[in-house]
């Protein structure tokens, strides 16, 4: 068992990744990072984090693709995943609200990257507290 929850943060925006991972570290979490969907999948298999915060739109494979791959793999299917995006409507072809859409495909939640980081930290704590 880990002393602190391990969070994998995945984003192709390096500055945002640095800011978010620093905030999470200072808030009592161990943090690892990945810069694309393939790195995220590999890190998930290797480290089995308690939560993955996954950017939706990245070059190459999308965060949605990576999250679904993680959820379909028997070794990683129980890892909690929450989507990150700064888009008001990350799935423009659906009528579902973004939080509902994330949950409908097996993700824990949707986190708006433009929110105050204290709100993000609280959402992370809330997600980890869920059974």
Question: Can you describe what each PLM-predicted range is?
Answer:
Residues 3-15, 20-24:
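Conserved acidic segment of CheY-like receiver
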Residues 28-35, 43:
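Short hydrophobic/Thr-rich beta-strand motif most characteristic of the beta2 strand and flanking loop
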Residues 55, 85:
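Active-site residues of response regulator receiver
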Residues 13, 56-57:
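The short loop immediately C-terminal to the conserved phospho-acceptor aspartate in CheY-like receiver
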Residues 65, 87-111, 115-122:
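Alpha4 helix (beta4-alpha4-beta5 surface) of REC/receiver domains from two-component response regulators
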Residues 1-6, 116-131:
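Non-catalytic signal-transmission and effector/linker regions of two-component phosphorelay proteins
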Residues 17, 59, 68, 77:
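The feature encodes the CheY-like receiver
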Residues 35-39, 62-68:
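Acidic catalytic/metal-coordinating carboxylates
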């Amino acid at each position: 068992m880990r002393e602190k929850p391990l969070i994998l943060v995945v984003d192709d925006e390096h500055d945002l990744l640095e800011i978010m991972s620093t905030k999470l570290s200072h808030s009592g979490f161990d943090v690892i990072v990945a810069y694309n969907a393939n790195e995220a999948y590999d890190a998930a298999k290797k480290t089995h984090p308690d939560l993955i915060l996954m950017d939706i739109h990245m070059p190459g494979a999308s965060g949605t693709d990576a999250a679904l791959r993680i959820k379909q793999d028997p070794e990683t299917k129980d890892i909690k995943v929450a989507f990150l995006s700064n888009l008001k409507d990350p799935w423009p072809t659906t009528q579902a609200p973004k939080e509902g859409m994330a949950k409908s495909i097996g993700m824990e939640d949707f986190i708006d990257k433009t929110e105050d980081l204290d709100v993000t930290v609280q959402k992370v704590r809330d997600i980890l507290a869920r059974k």
